[in-house]
Design a protein with these regions (language model features):
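Cytoplasmic helix-loop-helix junction between adjacent transmembrane helices
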Residues: 109-144
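Helix-to-loop junctions at the C-terminal end of transmembrane segments
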Residues: 60-74, 161, 261-273, 357
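A late C-terminal transmembrane helix in Major Facilitator Superfamily
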Residues: 329-359
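C-terminal transmembrane helical hairpin of 12-TM major facilitator-type secondary transporters
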Residues: 275-319
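Hydrophobic core of transmembrane alpha-helices in multi-pass small-molecule transporters
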Residues: 19, 100-116, 219, 300-314
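Transmembrane alpha-helical segments of major facilitator superfamily
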Residues: 50-58, 146, 249-258, 341-342
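Structural signature of the two symmetry-related core transmembrane helices
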Residues: 77-91, 174, 276-290, 370
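Helix-loop boundary and gating motifs at the non-cytosolic
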Residues: 3-55, 222, 226-239
Length: 389
């Protein structure tokens, strides 16, 4: 907390910008599948049609925004595009559109809105560099803001939907864009852009393989996390026979500990290095997911949920700085690549979960999630430390 108290006003505004931006998008993203099935009356498999458009388009959007930030395009107009896209998406959803319109128009618009997170993280990194703020700790606070937002946003939407319906919930989400816009106006100077940097030679015709391998580590961790998160509710309730509220308790325990772990991750990275922290997170994930596959009581779920929060908090606290360290001269590209690695991991995890569960069981999905930590350790063993700059 003393770190934040010592930050200049602008740095604190950036933290608030990231928090409210994440709260806005998190009020839409986790509800979408529920909305497609319950709100629009579609079949569950049709969720994949929407997700199959949003995920790859988000990857493209993040790449384009990252390249423009590295080419010294001002941050403010790029971020405004994503905020406007979010507002349009929330208004579209509040109209309860036909499914074809959601897929044809809503999915591309949501992909543009998703680009806000990458842009904000790049802006935070650039601001920290310019003002001599310790980057690893500041990134950890940015990531903690996202984690806190995801505690608030989804819960707010689901409770509102349960009480008054989808239309009101999405109108509230649209209203949140007003706060996001005010923070955008206050936190981002009109002419803020990346500094000009000397070109750094890369290997093998411009392909930075070490940067890609660093991003692959994040993709593999994201695959395991999404495999578990997607299968966990049905495994607990259907296969283990635990009460319906059990998944919510697990998520709550995870989120609380995750925030604490993000604080400690930066200090551990300073002492042992980010690769060691990520390796520790992967080992903890393997053990935790394997234990989850054998739970038989709510108490066990809550305890393991807290441990899961610690592993994911370690990852969340250092991952973005870890990837950025392999491209210090191109923070926009590195940040976009990091965000895309998470979206790619989420896409692979969500699709794979359905096939594995259909062929075997939801318990098998959780075992696969545990096994996904092994290639993380192998990739970290191969990956060399970043070049000093």
């Amino acid at each position: 907390m003393s770190f934040v108290l010592q930050l200049p006003r602008q740095a604190v505004l950036i933290l608030l910008l990231v928090f409210f931006g994440a709260m806005c998008t998190s009020s839409l993203i986790p509800v979408m599948g529920f909305f497609i099935v319950e709100g629009l009356g579609q079949q569950p498999w049709q969720i994949a049609l929407y997700s199959g458009i949003v995920a790859p388009l988000t990857i493209v959007v993040n790449r384009l925004l990252g390249e423009r930030l590295d080419r010294m395009v001002a941050v403010k107009p790029l971020l405004l595009i994503s905020i406007i896209a979010y507002l349009l998406m929330a208004l579209l959803l509040s109209s309860l559109p036909p499914f074809w319109l959601l897929v044809a128009v809503g999915a591309p618009v949501m992909a543009v809105a998703n680009g806000a997170t990458s842009t904000e993280f790049t802006y935070g990194r650039l601001y920290a560099e310019r003002h001599g703020i310790e980057i690893t700790q500041y990134n950890a606070w940015l990531r903690m803001g996202v984690s806190l937002a995801w505690v608030v946003g989804p819960a707010m939407s689901f409770i509102t939907i349960d009480l008054v319906g989808f239309r009101v919930a999405y109108m509230i989400s649209a209203g949140l864009a007003g706060i996001w816009f005010v923070l955008w106006h206050l936190a981002v100077p009109n002419d803020f852009r990346a500094p000009q940097r000397p070109p750094r030679p890369v290997e093998l015709d411009g392909i930075d393989w070490w940067l890609l391998l660093a991003a692959l580590v994040c993709t593999l961790i994201a695959i395991g996390n999404v495999l578990f998160t997607a299968a966990m509710p049905l495994f607990f309730v259907r296969e283990v026979g635990l009460p319906g509220y059990t998944p919510g308790l697990a998520i709550s325990a995870k989120c609380v500990v995750e925030v604490i772990a993000i604080f400690s991750a930066a200090r551990l990275a300073e002492r042992f290095g980010p690769r060691a922290v990520l390796a520790g997170a992967a080992i903890l994930a393997i053990l935790t997911f394997a234990a989850f596959a054998q739970v038989s009581s709510v108490l066990q779920v809550v305890i393991l949920g807290a441990i899961e929060g610690y592993y994911y908090g370690l990852f969340a606290g250092v991952a973005i700085s870890f990837v950025q360290s392999y491209a210090p001269d191109k923070p926009g590209r590195a940040t976009a690549l990091f965000m895309n690695s998470l979206y790619l991991g989420g896409f692979i995890g969500n699709v794979s979960m359905g096939f594995i569960a259909d062929a075997f069981s939801f318990q098998a999905v959780i075992y696969v999630a545990a096994a996904s930590g092994v290639p993380v350790l192998l990739a970290l063993a191969v990956l060399r430390p970043p070049r000093s700059t």
